[in-house]
Amino acid sequence: MIKPRTPPGVLELLPREQIAFQRMLDVIRRNYERFGFLPVETPVFELSDVLLTKSGGETERQVYFVQSTGTLANAAESGATRLPELALRFDLTVPLARYVAEYEHVLAFPFRRYQIQRVYRGERAQRGRFREFYQCDIDVIGKQTLSIRYDAEVLAVIHAVFSELGIGDFQVQLNNRKVLRGFLESQGVRDGELQLAVLREVDKLDKRGVLDVRDTLIGQGFGIPAAQVENILTFVATRSTSHADALARLDALIEDSGPGSHDMLRQGVAELREVLTLVNVLGVPEHAYRLNFSIARGLDYYTGTVYETSLINHPQIGSICSGGRYENLANHYTQSKLPGVGISIGLTRLFWQLRDAGLMDGIAESSVQAMVVLMDEATLDDALDIARCLRIGGINTEVQMEAKKVSKQFQYASRAGIRFVVLAGDDERARGVVAVKDLTREQQFEIPREELASTLQVELEQAKVM
């Protein structure tokens, strides 16, 4: 016998957890669509030369390649050493770049797309790291230009999604890479590659700590003078406490830098100010976002606004949603300039962390809302008719197809997480009613048959707001 098991790095859920996961997906999708984003799906595998155009190094080492057995045999016979023709996608950004470049002549710009699909990475097997996982992305792509106003709207989407998910108080940390790079210029760090390297180190502050990052910036090939490093670390420690405080800190940044401040710094401050102003207009409460000059995002293609979202009471979970603005999404695939802004929610990892922290307990029981008991074989037609009426009334209903002991049927409903159990014996049928047991409240009551579906619907709606 072969031992049944899954490969490491995948998240396989039992039905109750899968229901909770699916409901989170539904909330994310619903809010993406509410803001006018259109669904896109791309193939799970892409041509290797297309997928790997922008990657290299660590990314390429994590890619899963796809090869048919026939192609594999032919390659072995011929001694071919080149990469297989196909590879599984490792994120949704590169497929989006290919998609927009391929269809730019028919797409309407700005193109607002959402994509919720699995991606694959050859991660080292360890707790909390996944080789197959869901990403839930949105992006707004412009042609030649894209207004900074979309950056504010994206933050409003983040707020809408996590408000409805209801997984705890959260906060979006907001920054702009132009502010960071402009400040680095003011400290004498003017080389573009060195700036990117410094930003990657700043992005590691939470994981490595200030002392470790300071030592790295002063030595290890960076060679930045200690005084400038102290200025940089002091600058990135800036946090706002309110909307007004954020605007005041931006004003102070320009005043402190003087009339000769670098253009990039001034541009970044202006963009942040506009985003903050519009976020306020969009109705995002000021406690839901903060200005944080340490947010850099490690990916080099971000050029402006950057976001990171975290749960206030569970900081150990880390970022639950991140993203930012980029200047040219598809420069490897088209000569058109396609700037954009977007975010990604890594739902598989988020769900695993929430479950691990005990935050998913009781979130979902079953997608089945009612079960009809089969009293005996003679009442099968009646049980099926009750179930039919419930389904017509919008109640997800299961029927017991075998006349087992009633106690056994109740045990099944309880174990399956079904809230309502409906039964109709001879007495109930004679009086035109059904008996309903609410397993959640541990109450039993009778309902006229014609009112059964509407009554259960009211009970379910009330449970949503409790």
UniProtKB/Swiss-Prot annotation:
Coiled coil: none
Name this polypeptide is given: Histidine--tRNA ligase
One of the record's GO molecular function terms: ATP binding
Quaternary structure (record): Homodimer.
Catalytic activity: tRNA(His) + L-histidine + ATP = L-histidyl-tRNA(His) + AMP + diphosphate + H(+)
Pfam hit, one: tRNA-synt_His
Key words, A-Z: Aminoacyl-tRNA synthetase, ATP-binding, Cytoplasm, Ligase, Nucleotide-binding, Protein biosynthesis
InterPro entries registered for this protein in UniProt: aa-tRNA-synth_II, aa-tRNA-synth_II/BPL/LPL, Anticodon-bd, Anticodon-bd_dom_sf, His-tRNA-ligase, HisRS-like_core, HisRS/HisZ, HisRS_anticodon
The EC number(s) this enzyme carries: 6.1.1.21
Subcellular location as annotated: Cytoplasm
Gene3D superfamilies named among the record's database cross-references: Anticodon-binding domain (3.40.50.800), Bira Bifunctional Protein, Domain 2 (3.30.930.10)
One record GO biological process: histidyl-tRNA aminoacylation
Gene Ontology cellular component annotations, sorted alphabetically: cytoplasm
